[in-house]
Amino acid sequence: MEDFDFKLQPGQKLERSAKPSGKPLISIATAYYNCKDYIMQTANSILNQTFPFWEWNIVNDGSKEEGTKEILEKLEKLDSRIHVINQENAGRLVARDNAVKKAKADLVFILDSDDVIDKTYLECAYFTMLTNPDATWAYADTVTFDGQEFLWKKLFDCEEEKKENLLPVCALIKKQAILDVGGYAKVDKDVHEDWHMWLRMIEKGLYPVRMNFYGFWYRSKKEGGTMASIKNDASRQKHAEEEIKKQAKKIKHNVTALQYPMTTNFDFDSYPYVFDWDREKVNVDDKKNLLFIFPWFKLGGADKFNYDLLSSIDRNKYNITILTTEPCEYVWRQKFEKFGEVFDLTSFLHRRDWPAFIHYIMKSRSIDLVFESQSYFGYYVIPWLKSYFPEVPFVDYIHAENWGWRNGEYPRDSTGIAGLLDRTYTCTKYLKSEMETEMGRTTDNVLPVYIGVDETEFDETKVNIEDDEDLKEVYDKYKDMRKILYCCRISIEKRPILALKILKKLCSENSNTVLFVVGNGPNMQQMKKEASKLGLQKNIVFFGSKNDVKPFYKACDVELICSLSEGLTLTTYEAMAMKRPVVSANVGGQKELIDNTCGRIVDNIQKQQDLFIEDYSEEEIDRYAKALNEILDSKNYEEMKENARKKILNGFTIGNMKKIMTKEIEELTSNKSKVGLDSPKYREMYSQYLVLYNQLDQRTYFSDKGGIGVDGNFYEEKTQRLKDQLWKNPAWRGFIKFLQKTGIMKAAKKAGVDRKIKEKVAKNLK
């Protein structure tokens, strides 16, 4: 993975000090032999776990290394959960089995003495096993580090497992299952013992759960290890292969693993529930505890705001927990992990179990504030959570409305639960006004907060065009041309085909014009084909996605934004901070930052509801072309550049945003919630809200990445009960009216969902 940082190894320092009481829920089993150079990093990675309800059994297999006794005694004194057992040298397999036999917990976590684990591994694995009681073990994807550096992410396949070990040795396993198949020492030390044991389990029809995150860090020593020594000895390697083949032949039936992310294997009608949890608080310090619910970690304006917001929070005062609700790659996750603990719910839980896990997080962390932003699931789970934690403030931040989706998208969802939110933040004044006038939102608790830009980073005097190799290579060719920047995700709402037609119009008047396209997305290939069709090959350069776009702002003369829907784009802030005028569609709050002194605002003709129609009017194309020409040919161009940066410095910096949000968070966490205090009595209704969300959101989650396809069929309705009784409930009537207003009810009726939900409610009321 291009952006994965192998230097961010877990356990490089000790960060936590929780020492809970009670029986351990997980027993960690480690065989130790001559490993004093690595064991402390392993220990730190265990001590740093967000789930402290473990014991660690270290079996010293007669180590001869000088200093062994001292370092193991140091470990035992470090924490009462650590137990060192000394034995005569009998080999690592016997030592590991003895560590398993000493386990007090029903679940055993196998970890070698030189490997390390992500700080959330044990917590994720425990709840994966808890919510999949028929599974035998759970494991995560692997990071190989030290001697070699690469990522190991393989989907489980029973037939492939017979030929190649797809499974890491590190896993959370049912203790009894290990004992039932004879443990690790059933084979000799020259056989791949973990692979052999997995095959024995598969032979019995036992199956694993693969969690979809990089949780296990496997140390590949530069001097090699046991497996390397076997591979370098032909006779030993042959023996190992023969034993594996012999065991593989005993497997007569196919075994299928559960592999996240997925939306199958659960009832879409399932009610939210809570775990039976009575353990002490996980966080033992006096800090306030913040919970953030985001959809994902991706490269975009909303995610950059989330990142900037978290970076402003004083971690001496606050603990941070981040939950995400949509599958995504690891692109930014590592960046967010430095702020606190991160849980991608799609990577280790079924949707039916998400509410219970979030409830557990709030209870085990004593959460003081919940901050939701742009997660659909977040909006639907908040009412239910509020019914359990009425005194906890819930707030949300919204970036834009979208009239082409769900009658307004996130602002509409926020409006629907406004009575349960202590505060709503919007990225523009325009959005606050839209929520009030178009959605009927009472805006007394709505506060516009501009996302801002770091004016010290986006400063053209500190940026060189040569900093980007691709740009450096072609810049001289286009140096004397009029250069327009089109920097965004190449997707339908950004209207890339319109951008091409605007370029075509400009080139028909002045061929000395070029468009620099920076970004990627689902419509990139379409854009390239259309550019070729329009004969624009000499007037367009595709640079793809870039982590650092500053050189492109400096290289270009003006930025073009022709989107059909935006809030106030991050690229607008960045371009203007870099002294570049912007020509933008009159969408969202763009005109709050752009005026004729530093750019142009263009009124769109196309409506959001017509998003997928790419037959753009000549009048709209002419509007953009005219605005761009006015700037590119302006005698006041240099003055416009200066005005752009002055506008940023006058209230649109990231420092201003951080100052406002720091004050807001401090105030919210110092006081209990003032709204929704009666929400516990509406818990049943809020449960139905979540059921409805699941029903309307059935879909396939990336089957090529481990998810299993969903047929999308709704369950057959059986009866309809107590409709009149439901309607007599004023809270239910308000709920139904909200669904009707948003258009959700219409979709639900079409699918037959509304009848089934009312039946479920009636059954429970009865």
Question: Model-predicted segments: where are they?
Answer:
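N-proximal low-complexity "stem/linker" segments adjacent to membrane-targeting elements
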Residues: 1-45, 276-283
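Conserved donor NDP-sugar-binding/catalytic core segment of glycosyltransferases
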Residues: 120-151
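A conserved mid-protein helix/loop that constitutes part of the nucleotide-sugar donor-binding site
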Residues: 37, 303-308, 482, 486-505, ...
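Glycine-rich, basic loop-to-helix element that forms the pyrophosphate-binding segment
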Residues: 87-103
